[in-house]
Amino acid sequence: MAHSVGIKDVARAAGVSVGTVSNVINRPDTVASETRARVLSAIDRLGYVRSESARQLRAGRSRIMGLLVLDMGNPFFVDVTRGAERAARDAGLGVMVCNSAQSTGEEAEYLALFAEQRVRGVLLTPTDASGRNIDAFRRHQIPFVLVDRVAEGTTECSVSVDDVAGGALAVRHLVDAGHRSIAYVSGPSGLNQVRDRRTGALNALAEAGLGEDVLRELPTERLDVAAGRDAGARLLGLADRPTAVFCANDLLALGVLQAMFSAGVRVPDDLAIVGYDDIEFAAAAAVPLTSVRQPAVTMGALAAELLLEETEAETASRPHEH
């Protein structure tokens, strides 16, 4: 097996101490030019590559930002990641992306991994409303910013849209189009986003003088296309089928759309569908979906920039207002 070249090998080849090699790498201005040239020549000749990660861990910090999302199969979170990665790269950082797959167990494991790797900070979309994993993560004193989730307390930072207003916008559109029987394909009830969008939908009905019974909820365990197809099948089985559907995200809406096509139901003639997120796939569907837009790339970039502000404030030992 080939020997991995270390700093001691460089020192031996250059005829200097390990400390001198370290100074050439980290503080070259403190080393005489002749000695510095000899060390650099040895580095080139031996092909030495310093262990940046080890150096950073010894210093108690990393140039990696953690990003934990609900579902990397959702184009919304792909766009969030793009925005976060761009902002991190501009700051000289990399991004470690992990997917909780909407599992609190996997979320806990990845947060533990981030702590073990001593990441600079974490961007996180929580899996549920309880915040148990977040509470456990706080003890590591690693800065974090919530993405697509409103912070509950005053000590946390978050980047999100107003999901109550978004839910109201979607249902107001359907009510204005004359619909008086609307289904809400909601997703997991533990997600704040799902609950807030439902609250907004009910607010829109109240504004229109309509009762809550106008909205019929069809919960799903996940926020993906397969769950949308299942909800669509349940919708088709209703005796008094609603004339419109509001879906908690676009993947659910695409699944409902597929179920309707398979059953010969015309969209939007027989059933109107409104999604949420305005992902590119929704606009490219056989029947382009109406959707509430979320600026995912911008949200990711803003969250990363906010996290960098948090880490800088922590390094400077000063309070940071947000």
Each model region followed by its residue ranges:
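Flexible loop/turn connectors
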Residues: 233-234, 238-322
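Short acidic capping loops at alpha-helix termini that bridge into adjacent secondary structure
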Residues: 180-182, 212-216, 267-272
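Periplasmic-binding protein-like
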Residues: 67, 118-126, 183-186, 218, ...
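Short beta-strand segments enriched in small/hydrophobic residues
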Residues: 18-22, 57-73, 173, 181-188
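N-terminal helix-turn-helix DNA-binding module of bacterial transcription factors
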Residues: 1-63
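Hinge/beta->alpha junction and helix N-cap segments in small-molecule ligand-binding domains
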Residues: 52, 69-79, 97-106, 132, ...
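Alpha-helical recognition/docking segments in bacterial nutrient-uptake
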Residues: 1-2, 60-172, 176, 237
